[in-house]
């Protein structure tokens, strides 16, 4: 199971949501800095699909996925597209879109309903993957 919480999978940030540059937690500037450190160089250069999953051409051999992302997250568009591509490749993928949630908002506001929904979906996906979910 790919259990992905607002994953950072595209080093190019070429989407509309990838242009978010005014959020104090995670924005385009902090993300480019993270990619630069991770890729040991320029964040905008082509990256291996092993480093940036969005660069992969063939997703058909990947395991099932559970992806959670908020509508106010820098990674929203790339995560939704990754889920679409997984499904198109025949890989079971559940996409949980969380209205109003920004990147790591669940960490800052764990009691918020949207945060609790995120954690409930994660717990259920993990329980199902391990075969211990209540019927």
Where are these regions (language model features)?
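Alpha/beta-hydrolase superfamily serine-hydrolase fold, recognizing
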Residues: 1-135
């Amino acid at each position: 199971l790919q259990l992905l919480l607002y994953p950072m999978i595209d080093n190019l940030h070429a989407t509309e949501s990838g242009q978010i540059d005014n959020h104090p937690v995670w924005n385009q500037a902090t993300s480019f800095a993270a990619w630069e450190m991770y890729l040991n160089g320029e964040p905008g250069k082509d990256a291996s699909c092993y480093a940036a999953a969005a660069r992969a051409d063939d997703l058909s051999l990947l395991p099932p996925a559970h992806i959670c992302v908020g509508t106010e997250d820098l990674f929203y568009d790339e995560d939704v597209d990754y889920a679409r591509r997984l499904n198109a490749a025949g890989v079971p993928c559940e996409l949980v879109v969380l209205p109003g949630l920004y990147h790591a908002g669940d960490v800052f506001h764990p009691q918020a309903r949207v945060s609790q929904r995120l954690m409930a979906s994660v717990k259920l996906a993990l329980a199902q993957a391990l075969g211990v979910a209540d019927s």
